[in-house]
Amino acid sequence: MIYRITKYDPTLRDAEGRYLPWTWTSYSDIGRAVNGCALCPAAYLETERRYTDALICILQALHVDALRVKELEPPVRSSAVLQNDFAEKGLSLSAAQADFLRRVADISEISVPDFEVCFQLQLRECFWCRLVDPQGRAAVWFGYDYYMYVACKEIPAALVRKICAGGLYVEAQTTKGSWLNQNIT
């Protein structure tokens, strides 16, 4: 099963699945008007935290303690360039994030201590990759417009309720014949 996890209420989609209200879709929207108010760094960071917390809880529930880095897409922008980009938006690049960026091109697998930083940097569009559990229990990736995907057999219902109570939406996607039905490792 592939789960799409987003901040977007599925009841506000049209028949083709497009989200109808205009909203922010990237950290680059910080400072732009969203429904009459400028998106501030604090609101962005709160949403980013909800995404990373949800994903970490899912991986814990699935007993995933490592993820292989697959399909890493360059370019990975330099820490100096990102620091300037983030500063313009009222964000910063932490020492842990800068360290991860220096190492990402050479990393084949990440462990729990790197999960949060890796997810934050992908949400901030610093790089893209698919992350796959070596045991085949899950795969994770981020899409355009602040979409997050988890492929796994099942996210426990209680955890789905907890994530939804935290302001995110978990939608099961049925994709017959997808790569998920093959070997995801």
Describe each PLM feature range.
Residues 1-147, 151-185:
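Structured alpha/beta or helical-core interaction and ligand-binding surfaces enriched in interleaved
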